[in-house]
Amino acid sequence: MEVVIVPDAKAGGELIAEAMAALVRRKPDALLGVATGSTPLPIYEALAGKVRAGLVDASKARICQLDEYVGLPTGHPESYRAVVLREVVEPLGLSEASFMGPDGSAEDIVAACEAYDRALAEAGGVDLQLLGIGTDGHIGFNEPCSSLASRTRIKTLTEQTRVDNARFFDDDIDQVPHHVITQGIGTILDARHLVLLATGEGKAEAVAQTVEGPLSALVPASALQLHRHATVVVDEAAASKLKLADYFRHTYANKPAWQGL
């Protein structure tokens, strides 16, 4: 696992956007897994800026979803399908045909989960998966005590996650669904490159447990320790509880440029 400490969220977004752009230059039809929430917005803004400036041609890139609420009506503005189309697909100039995600409105949710895992495999696998992290260490919607071998499935949200997400529903927790479809930890680990971005002091403890704590289902993000190519990008506030912060700064400062992220 590589840990990169950046000054702020904007710097983290630019760094990751350039890594995504470099991937698309090497592999124009790369399958990019995206996350929702406020944390990755600087990434999407920076990547869209590169597309507009002609620095990368993303016209053949493909986008896939990490998770989806269960039970929101089709077209609900806070369904993750709608969010990804609005914040990622459209700004990159891509069509909806380039996008794939689980069906949270399906009658048979179990079948929809299995179908999404198959679709990801049939698409050749995810080349780069973006991740955020919850204050309790969850990734996707794999809450604490999720199986580290889990596949795409339905999960019940913790009350803390519902509280955290109420800001997207007019601060009304009653509007936040109780269930989601999420890629499992095992599904996430299938991606070729995992990139986790965390910003703010509120994420510092979760970051420290992920990077320096034991591998544990209590901290789902700690599964990144098992991945052959995992990158954790954090701002100074989110890095504030890392015991090895100085070491991480030193190794990144002396990293050969040709290695990339």
Residue locations for each model-derived region?
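ATP/nucleoside-binding phosphotransfer catalytic cores, i.e., glycine-rich phosphate-binding loops
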Residues: 186, 190-261
